[in-house]
Design a protein with these regions (language model features):
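Structural marker of alpha-solenoid helical repeat scaffolds
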Residues: 60, 93-95, 128-129, 162-163, ...
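Register position in tetratricopeptide repeats
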Residues: 43, 77, 111-112, 145, ...
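Canonical positions in the second alpha-helix
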Residues: 57, 90-91, 124-125, 158-159, ...
Length: 330
């Protein structure tokens, strides 16, 4: 109930602000309302509206540190780094324990490709913040910029210890494990993560991908299936489960998974081609050819589709038709 009230207040502030712009009447908003409005427009990619809101906000609240930090964030985004840095130094003189000042300073150094200094500043922010997850995530990104995958991995792990639901950190930690050729260790990490967060479809999906890479197709299928039980519209998990099932020669189950991807979204030439290949393995030539034709209809430029039809006719010893289709593949 509390959350819905907050959302209602937020939507009311936004509609009130947009109504003000249309009527040219100047209405009062508190500084936090303005911050939310500005950040909303930035998230929506509406920079001009964000700038209008910021101008009005600073006219009404010229001493608001929060609004000045939003202004600095926008200056950094526009690569006006020197102006942003000057403003940060002025704010630091007033509020030396504000962690956002250190985070924005780190952002400036990061933009200047001085990632070591950015990490130093973020380490200082850690001593002041209550939002450890966000800062650890930022530190992880700086280490990625420096190609220090080991330290990046440790930072993302710390981020997930603080906020187990941080999906970007989860993807990033798996990326680091993979880049470091630590696929077995990645699976062990994900198993522990899943023990704490068993309904994370992303963790199950990533686990499946890693098992697939290690050619452990049985465990890959198990992981992908858990991902699809949790999220019945997880297109990627159905697609990759189809691939793993093919490896196990479970062609009917693979077809079912590929067909699910077509139900969930527009058909892809890849899924149609794989369905055709599975039917061919099952000896169902009519369905195989039907799906190969659907493949080239969906993507006439996909040479693999034309080659599949060519191979099909070669196996039928119908070389005349095979020649027609091989020419389309070239």
């Amino acid at each position: 109930m509390h959350l819905s009230e907050e959302e209602d207040d937020y939507n009311l502030s936004l509609s009130k602000f947009e109504s003000m712009l249309k009527t040219n009447k100047v209405l009062f908003f508190d500084s936090e309302e303005f911050e939310e409005i500005i950040l909303h427009y930035l998230d929506m990619g509406k920079a001009n509206l964000a700038k209008k809101a910021l101008k009005l906000a600073l006219e009404q609240h010229p001493k608001s540190t929060g609004l000045k930090l939003v202004q600095i964030e926008m200056l950094v985004y526009d690569d006006k780094l020197d102006i942003a840095e000057k403003m940060l130094n002025e704010l630091y003189a007033i509020e030396p324990t504000n962690e956002e000042i250190f985070i924005q300073k780190a952002n400036i150094y990061s933009k200047r490709d001085n990632h070591e200094k950015a990490v130093e500043l973020l380490q200082e922010a850690l001593l002041l913040t209550e939002d450890f997850a966000d800062v650890y995530n930022l530190i992880g990104m700086e280490y990625l910029f420096m190609d220090n995958l080991e330290m990046a991995k440790e930072s993302f792990i710390k981020c997930l210890e603080e906020d187990i639901e941080d999906q970007s950190a989860l993807y990033n930690v798996v990326y680091c494990f993979e880049f470091l050729d630590q696929n077995v260790e990645a699976i062990e990490y994900l198993k522990k993560y899943i023990d704490k967060n068993p309904y994370s479809e992303i963790a199950w999906h990533q686990c499946g991908r890693l098992y697939y890479g290690l050619k452990d197709y049985e465990n890959a299928v198990r992981a992908f299936e858990f991902a699809t039980y949790i999220d019945e519209e997880f297109l990627g998990a159905f697609m990759e489960n189809g691939k793993a099932l093919e490896r196990l020669k479970r062609y009917e189950d693979a077809i079912e998974n590929y067909k699910k991807t077509i139900e969930l979204d527009d058909p892809t030439s890849y899924a149609l081609l794989r369905i055709g290949k599975c039917f061919e393995k099952l000896g169902n030539k009519v369905e195989a050819l039907k799906y190969f034709n659907k493949t080239v209809h969906e993507d006439p430029l996909l040479d693999k589709g034309w080659i599949a039809i060519t191979d099909f006719y070669v196996r039928q010893k119908n070389y005349k038709k095979a020649l027609i289709y091989v020419n389309k593949a070239i």
